[in-house]
């Protein structure tokens, strides 16, 4: 458990330093600016592909978080999407936490939260 907390702190530190990886010339075209996603530069004369100083950074393995905590919630729990009360029975309260789906209504949401409290399961978006 102590190792997991240490790795989560390392991951938070890495994420703070990590730049936004935007595609080459994202500033030039509105369709790139409004939908910012990474695309690898493939041009033969591309300064970004050659990794010249002053050009935007490219994603590489060094920016990744530790494998043991990759994909976990910042609290250290693995997120499980819950649609009904029956889904709560499948959750291991020591390593997993529930996230109530967006499509669940108010009445069922209250039932899920009450049952989670009985089972000792953490709900990430209880409101």
Swiss-Prot record:
Residues 37-65 are annotated as: Disordered. GO terms for molecular function: structural constituent of ribosome. GO terms for cellular component: cytosolic large ribosomal subunit. It comes from the Archaea. InterPro entries: Ribosomal_eL32, Ribosomal_eL32_arc, Ribosomal_eL32_CS, Ribosomal_eL32_sf. Keywords: Ribonucleoprotein, Ribosomal protein. The keyword Ribonucleoprotein applies. GO terms for biological process: translation. Residues 37-48 have a biased composition (Basic and acidic residues). Belongs to the eukaryotic ribosomal protein eL32 family. NCBIfam families: PRK08562.1 (NF006332). This is Large ribosomal subunit protein eL32.
């Amino acid at each position: 458990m102590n190792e997991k907390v240490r790795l989560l702190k390392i991951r938070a530190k890495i994420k703070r330093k990590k730049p936004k990886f935007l595609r080459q010339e994202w500033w030039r075209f509105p369709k790139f600016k409004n939908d910012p996603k990474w695309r690898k530069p493939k041009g033969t004369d591309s300064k970004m592909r050659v990794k010249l100083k002053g050009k935007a950074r490219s994603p590489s393995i060094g920016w990744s978080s530790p494998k043991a905590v990759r994909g976990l919630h910042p609290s250290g729990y693995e997120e499980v999407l819950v649609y009904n009360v029956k889904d709560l029975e499948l959750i291991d309260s020591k390593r997993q936490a529930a996230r109530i789906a967006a499509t669940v209504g108010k009445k069922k949401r209250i039932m899920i939260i009450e049952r989670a409290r009985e089972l000792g399961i953490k709900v990430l978006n209880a409101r």
